């Protein structure tokens, strides 16, 4: 999800484990999270969900921190956005492993950490 876009869920997006994981498995976990989020919203009478800017910034910082512990930052690869002249170099995929990614996502459902839900 992205700040300023209420109820906009998207799969296989930037800073997910996309290129570093099995595609169908990734989409299944993300899809299950979306279904669970919507079901929880319905049960609690909520109609909108939006990621906070702070959550977006924190996620980017986590992805950067994890990436900085690898050799990725020193490579000229599309993983770092180096294939587009002038584009800022940053990690485009979650490099923390799929189990951690799933745990981070599931944790966000507990109390809607990082979201405004109304």
Q: Which residue ranges define each predicted feature?
A:
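FAD-site-proximal beta/loop scaffold in flavoenzymes
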Residues: 1-10
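C-terminal, flexible cofactor-proximal segment of oxidoreductases
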Residues: 9-118
């Amino acid at each position: 999800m992205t700040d300023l876009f209420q109820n906009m869920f998207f799969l296989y997006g930037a800073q997910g484990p996309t290129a570093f994981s099995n595609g169908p498995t990734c989409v299944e976990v993300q899809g299950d999270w979306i279904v669970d989020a919507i079901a929880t919203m319905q049960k609690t009478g909520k109609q909108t969900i939006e990621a906070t800017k702070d959550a977006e910034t924190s996620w980017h910082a986590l992805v950067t921190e994890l990436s900085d512990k690898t050799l990725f930052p020193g490579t000229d690869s599309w993983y770092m956005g180096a294939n587009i002249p002038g584009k800022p170099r940053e990690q485009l995929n979650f490099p923390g492993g799929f189990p951690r990614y799933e745990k981070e996502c599931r944790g966000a459902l507990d109390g809607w950490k990082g979201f405004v839900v109304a």
